């Protein structure tokens, strides 16, 4: 018997369709409110030049980072010490990967619970609507947990460059966590130590041109669960953030060679809510593709989540210490519950509307209308 052919999944990168598939269409309240290229200057750009010097420079940098974390929980860093050539190589190789034929990318398909590889049109737990993107991801720390069989072997040099990139981003993340630890009145290593054995996951996002970008998202609104995230993005634009519950959104201005830094839920809890964990999302456009590389720094699953410093007059934002694994499980449960509640409300509203339409059609005429 001949083997059954497996259908190639829909890949946005090779789509020539002019109408968005229904599986990507978002409810109206989730659709973009601000264009991908209407940029805001609200997110500060902070130079890290002199961060290792024990003088006024470090104190000034610390002050700026803390202010940004207390306001938005998002800022950009330049003069960060990550080589421009490495950044260029990483972005070039990422684009080359997504330009590969489908069969080359799908060799690293993550379906079936595989850890690391290629994902097509992901969606958050409990949702049917898909994000307009393709992803390749790999787990780089702890080093002993690396599974190079899940790291793509194309294009050439991918593994060597991504390995170096991961190491440099780990160094930068620890440096930033040191600043925040000091701001909380703790030892420089406090936040890093709270992660126990820091986990690092790199997610390379490719957002292809979209036929109807006003109907969908590249990545739905969310907060990151981990400690801190460093995002490298190209100059297209599409990263958006909100700090008022989604009433207003801003598009982060791309800065050449900069990393966008945002605090995750774990970092928010460790600071007892002092440092914000901003909701953010990615929008797409019909003119050009967009690339971003997110490096997530997360605590070990068994790391304890509880405020490290509670200021006078404050109450802990958590009732009790829990593990990061439990914190993440609760987050996923809440997300699933909210998705189900929204789905139920949508169904009920549709039923009410349909009933109203039927009643409007069969409504008998009043006596005055008959005798008129």
Curated annotation (Swiss-Prot):
Q: What is its EC number?
A: 1.14.11.9
Residue ranges of every copy of the Fe2OG dioxygenase domain listed in the record = 195-299
Pathways involved: Flavonoid metabolism
Has UniProt tagged this entry with the keyword Translocase? no
One term of GO molecular function: flavanone 3-dioxygenase activity
Record keywords = Dioxygenase, Flavonoid biosynthesis, Iron, Metal-binding, Oxidoreductase, Vitamin C
User: Which cofactors are named for this entry?
Assistant: L-ascorbate; Fe(2+)
Matching entries from InterPro entries are given as: DIOX_N, IPNS-like_FE2OG_OXY, IPNS-like_sf, Oxoglu/Fe-dep_dioxygenase_dom, Plant_2OG-oxidoreductases
- Provide the free-text tissue specificity comment from this protein's UniProt record: Expressed in young cromes.
Q: Name one GO biological process term.
A: flavonoid biosynthetic process
User: What does the note accompanying the cofactor annotation read?
Assistant: Binds 1 ascorbate molecule per subunit.
Which reaction is the catalytic activity of this chain? a (2S)-flavan-4-one + 2-oxoglutarate + O2 = a (2R,3R)-dihydroflavonol + succinate + CO2; (2S)-naringenin + 2-oxoglutarate + O2 = (2R,3R)-dihydrokaempferol + succinate + CO2; (S)-eriodictyol + 2-oxoglutarate + O2 = (2R,3R)-dihydroquercetin + succinate + CO2
Q: Where does Fe cation bind?
A: 222, 224, 280
Q: Which residues bind 2-oxoglutarate?
A: 290
Family, as annotated: Belongs to the iron/ascorbate-dependent oxidoreductase family.
Q: What does this protein do?
A: Catalyzes the 3-beta-hydroxylation of (2S)-flavanones to 2R,3R-dihydroflavonols, which are intermediates in the biosynthesis of flavonols, anthocyanidins, catechins and proanthocyanidins in plants. Can act on naringenin to produce dihydrokaempferol, and on eriodictyol to produced dihydroquercetin.
Q: What is this protein called?
A: Flavanone 3-dioxygenase F3H2
């Amino acid at each position: 018997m001949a083997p059954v052919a497996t259908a190639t999944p829909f890949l946005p990168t090779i789509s020539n369709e002019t109408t968005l598939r229904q599986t990507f269409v978002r409810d109206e309240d989730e659709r973009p409110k601000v264009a991908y290229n209407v940029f805001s200057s609200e997110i500060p750009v902070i130079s890290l030049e002199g961060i290792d010097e024990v003088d006024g420079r470090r104190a000034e940098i610390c002050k700026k980072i803390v202010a940004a974390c207390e306001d938005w929980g998002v800022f950009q860093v330049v003069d960060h010490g990550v080589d421009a050539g490495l950044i260029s190589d990483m972005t070039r190789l990422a684009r080359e990967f997504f330009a590969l034929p489908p069969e080359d990318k799908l060799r690293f398909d993550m379906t079936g619970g595989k850890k690391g590889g290629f994902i097509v049109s992901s969606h958050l737990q409990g949702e049917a609507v898909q994000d307009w993107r393709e992803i390749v991801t790999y787990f780089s720390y702890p080093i002993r947990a690396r599974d190079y069989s899940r790291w793509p072997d194309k294009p050439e040099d991918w593994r060597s460059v991504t390995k170096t990139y991961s190491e440099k981003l780990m160094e930068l993340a620890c440096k930033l966590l040191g600043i925040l630890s000091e701001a909380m009145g703790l030892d420089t290593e406090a936040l890093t130590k709270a992660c126990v054995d820091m986990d690092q996951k790199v997610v390379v996002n490719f957002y292809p041109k979209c036929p109807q970008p006003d109907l969908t998202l590249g990545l739905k609104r969310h907060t990151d669960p981990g400690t801190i995230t460093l995002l490298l993005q190209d100059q297209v634009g599409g990263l958006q953030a909100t700090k008022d519950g989604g009433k207003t959104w801003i598009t982060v201005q791309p800065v050449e060679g900069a990393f966008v830094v945002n605090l995750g839920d774990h970092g928010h809890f460790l600071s007892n809510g002092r440092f914000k964990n901003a909701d953010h999302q990615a929008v797409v456009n019909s003119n050009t593709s967009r690339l971003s590389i997110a490096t997530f720094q997360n605590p070990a699953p068994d790391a304890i989540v509880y405020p490290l410093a509670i200021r006078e007059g404050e109450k802990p934002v958590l009732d009790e210490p829990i593990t990061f694994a439990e914190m993440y499980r609760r987050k996923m449960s809440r997300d699933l519950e909210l998705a189900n509640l929204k789905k139920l409300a949508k169904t009920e509203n549709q039923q009410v509307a349909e009933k109203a339409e039927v009643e409007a059609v069969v409504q008998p005429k009043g006596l005055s209308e008959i005798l008129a």
